[in-house]
Swiss-Prot record:
Residues 29-690 are extracellular. The gene is PCDHB13. This is Protocadherin beta-13. It comes from Pan troglodytes (Chimpanzee). It comes from the Eukaryota. Potential calcium-dependent cell-adhesion protein. May be involved in the establishment and maintenance of specific neuronal connections in the brain.
């Protein structure tokens, strides 16, 4: 249906595009003439246009021949199958044209593909279907007995609605011995009888005569009408009335009211008495004149009896008779010219109208119409216009106008136009006619879908359920119908290694995005891809937008203690000299968290201790320090449980167990060797054990650090290959440890070992870091710092 509609629309455009050329050319071509006798029955054959135009029947049907008329009524109809031009109805020449001869009805013939335009006319031929009729069936003629032979007496004429030879041809009078009748012709072509006296009358012999006047037309056979003429023979009256002027010319506006004084005629009679009394009357007035004017018989004032209409009759020739009391009369002629006033508004006849029209086609013909005005002169001149703010224009050819688009339209800016065609004449006052029409604009796919955002950022928390709705994209299309229906799709990723089709999917109808599988922040922190939106137009238009998916970390990893190792083997023992000052660094708990952000921010606290208050843990970095001075009363062995907790919700934690051994004589960085050294065998054995233990711990610690670094680097490499990894960042809370450096120890611990001699027990006497904990030159400040030790070092003491 849509394709068919577009085809019809194109055909109309082609037709109307050539119409102006056809109209201008048609004015110069000789019109084709046809004729038909009036009173011919409707549907009667006039001509075969196919033969007249030299077209075969198939070609005639293909070219869509049409017959149009400038008037509001077309009296002809065209059979599209046969090409026969037929009458619509029975034609009455007298109703169509009155006394106008010839009676011609004009029409136009339009052909399409290619466009042609012919002027044609149909002449309605008069038949003798009306008989002459005398308006006055009886006429009285007063004739003085003193009238000499040859005196003429004009009689009232008969009326015949037919024209040409079917109109009145002559008059005859019944046989008599005194009168004969002559047929006279007026200036307007109408014929009237004139009674001529052949033999003088004698009132004493014959006071009156009765004659029959017959009017004959020229038809075949002729028709006739009769009237009775009564002739009254009068005594002698030798002076006839005379008008002041034999001819009067007056002009009167067609809008003059009934009763308006047209003119006053005046006649005088030199006779006196009864023979000098004059009466005025309309002489030989037609039915139309008798209905339109009246004359005062005493004063000679001619007045209007009904409203004039310039469009029907432009002038009247009125004969006035002034008769005295005797037999004499005088006559004059009054020519009354009707002045046109602007009393008819212009008329608009719509021949073709197209709606809707495509938005991207300039100079598309929207409407074809004709204008006319029954007035004349300036009152009949017409101007045609539309609103100035519309993208349409009018082109004219004769009295035809074409409304067409001035430029390509945009349906998205305006889907319809209300056009008012204003037709105004140039009369005073000006009259106008307005025709309103609504033109709909058909949509063309000239707008691509537009996303509401150029890029979208979606957040998905890791460990999501498959098929989770993670967000939506939206695009709109300013077109309508199928041109505005949007389909969404995933575009191929720029990174060929990104398994996009296994990560997300999109609903083609509404743009909803779904995660196809559970995401792991530690494996993939984020990725980006492009989505496309295409409409259903022809050709289809599309656009695209960028979508970023950020995987939000969930606290799904507990802290992992790197040092001291918690592998269930021999516990790690830290040696602390009893002479250690408060704040002495015992060791440092090192831990990492596989999560990120605040889920990886770690804090440390002393969960359990053999002797509460002796040791404390620095909450920020996990350093274990002495909280006070050691005494001889303190136990030699201590077991500490350090809790490592992240800042996730809910938080996760791990526990590190430390063994601390308090050792005598371990208070100075370097102690002198005893005077009596142990035996060589005992010293060698103890040294070997100590070196092996220290090497094992150091190797295991170094291996753990390297393994952790390798794992982190491997994960970052994998995340970079899948997509850009976006890790949330934020300020580090003051009470948490920054895990920069992948959780490795921030200080390298080095130990020196000394064996005490003389006891013979190979007792381990000295082990401490070479990095001093406090400046040795300021013992006073160290003691002062003990008073604020927990605040300065952030210990968590049990």
């Amino acid at each position: 249906m849509e394709a068919s509609g577009k085809l019809i629309c194109r055909q109309r455009q082609v037709l109307f595009s050539f119409l102006l050329l056809g109209l201008s050319l048609a004015g110069a071509a000789e019109p084709r003439s046809y004729s038909v006798v009036e009173e011919t029955e409707g549907s009667s054959f006039v001509t075969n246009l196919a033969k007249d135009l030299g077209l075969e029947q198939r070609e005639f049907s293909r070219r869509g021949v049409r017959v149009v008329s400038r008037g509001n009524k077309l009296h002809l109809q065209l059979n599209q199958e046969t090409g026969d031009l037929l009458l619509n109805e029975k034609l009455d020449r007298e109703d169509l044209c009155g006394h106008t001869e010839p009676c011609v009805l004009r029409f136009q013939v339009l052909l399409e593909s290619p466009f042609e335009f012919f002027q044609a006319e149909l002449q309605v031929i008069d038949i003798n279907d009306h008989s002459p009729v005398f308006l006055d069936k009886q006429m009285l003629v007063k004739v003085s007995e003193s009238s000499p032979p040859g005196t003429a007496f004009p009689l009232k004429n008969a009326e015949d609605l037919d024209v040409g030879q079917n109109n009145i041809e002559n008059y005859i009078i019944s046989p008599n011995s005194h009168f004969r009748v002559l047929t006279r012709k007026r200036s307007d072509g109408r014929k009237y009888p004139e009674l001529v006296l052949d033999k003088a009358l004698d009132r004493e012999e014959e006071a009156e005569l009765r004659l029959t006047l017959t009017a004959l037309d020229g038809g075949s056979p002729p028709r006739s009408g009769t009237a009775q003429v009564y002739i009254e023979v009068l005594d002698v009256n030798d002076n006839a009335p005379e008008f002041e002027q034999p001819f009067y010319r007056v002009q009167i506006s067609e809008d003059s009211p009934v009763g308006f004084l047209v003119v006053k005629v005046s006649a005088t009679d030199v006779d006196t008495g009864v023979n000098g009394e004059i009466s005025y009357s309309l002489f030989q007035a037609s039915e139309e004149i008798g209905k339109t004017f009246k004359i005062n018989p005493l004063t000679g004032e001619i007045e209007l009896k009904k409203q004039l209409d310039f469009e029907k009759l432009q002038s009247y020739e009125v004969n006035i008779e002034a008769r005295d009391a005797g037999t004499f009369s005088g006559k004059c002629t009054v020519l009354i010219q009707v002045i046109d006033v602007n009393d008819h508004a212009p008329e608009v006849t719509m021949s073709a109208f197209t709606s809707p029209i495509p938005e991207n086609a300039p100079e598309t013909v929207v409407a074809l119409f004709s204008v006319s005005d029954l007035d004349s002169g300036e009152n009949g001149k017409i101007s045609c216009s539309i609103q100035e703010d519309l993208p349409f224009l009018l082109k004219s050819a004769e009295n035809f106008y074409t409304l067409l688009t001035e430029r390509p339209l945009d349906r998205e800016s305006r889907a319809e136009y209300n056009i008012t065609i204003t037709v105004t004449d140039l009369g005073t006052p000006m009259l106008k006619t307005q025709l309103n029409m609504t033109v709909l604009i058909a949509d063309v796919n000239d707008n691509a879908p537009a996303f509401t955002q150029t890029s979208y950022t979606l957040f998905v928390r890791e460990n999501n359920s498959p098929a989770l709705h993670i967000g939506s994209v939206s695009a709109t299309d300013r077109d309508s119908g199928t041109n505005a229906q949007v389909t969404y799709s995933l575009l191929p990723p720029q990174d060929p290694h990104l398994p996009l089709t296994s990560l997300v999917s999109i609903n083609a109808d509404n743009g909803h995005l779904f995660a196809l599988r559970s995401l792991d922040y530690e494996a993939l922190q984020g990725f980006e891809f492009r989505v496309g939106a295409s409409d259903h137009g022809s050709p289809a238009l599309s656009s695209e937008a960028l979508v970023r998916v950020l995987v939000l970390d969930a606290n799904d990893n507990s802290p992992f203690v790197l040092y001291p190792l918690q592998n269930g083997s021999a516990p790690c023992t830290e040696l602390v000299p009893r002479a250690a000052e408060p704040g002495y660094l015992v060791t440092k708990v090192v831990a990492v968290d596989g999560d990120s952000g605040q889920n990886a921010w770690l804090s440390y606290q002393l969960l359990k201790a053999t002797e509460p208050g002796l040791f404390g843990v620095w909450a920020h970095n996990g350093e274990v320090r002495t909280a006070r001075l050691l005494s001889e009363r303190d136990a030699a062995k201590h077991r500490l449980a350090v809790l490592v907790k992240d800042n996730g919700e809910p938080p996760r934690s791990a526990t590190a167990t430390l063994h601390v051994l308090l050792v005598d004589g371990f208070s100075q960085p370097y102690l002198p060797l005893p005077e009596a050294a142990p035996t060589q065998a005992q010293a060698d054995s103890l040294t070997v054990y100590l070196v092996v233990a220290l090497a094992s711990v150091s190797s295991l610690f170094l291996f753990s650090v390297l393994l952790f670094v390798a794992v982190r680097l491997c994960r970052r490499s994998r995340a970079a290959s899948v997509g850009r990894c976006l890790v949330p960042e934020g300020p580090l809370p003051g009470h948490l440890v920054d895990m920069g450096g992948t959780g490795t120890l921030s200080q390298s611990y080095q130990y020196e070992v000394c064996l005490a001699g003389g006891s013979g027990t190979n007792e381990f006497k000295f082990l401490k870091p070479i990095i001093p904990n406090f400046p040795p030159q300021c013992p006073g400040k160290e003691i002062q710092g003990n008073s604020t030790f927990p605040n300065n070092f952030g210990f968590n003491i049990q």
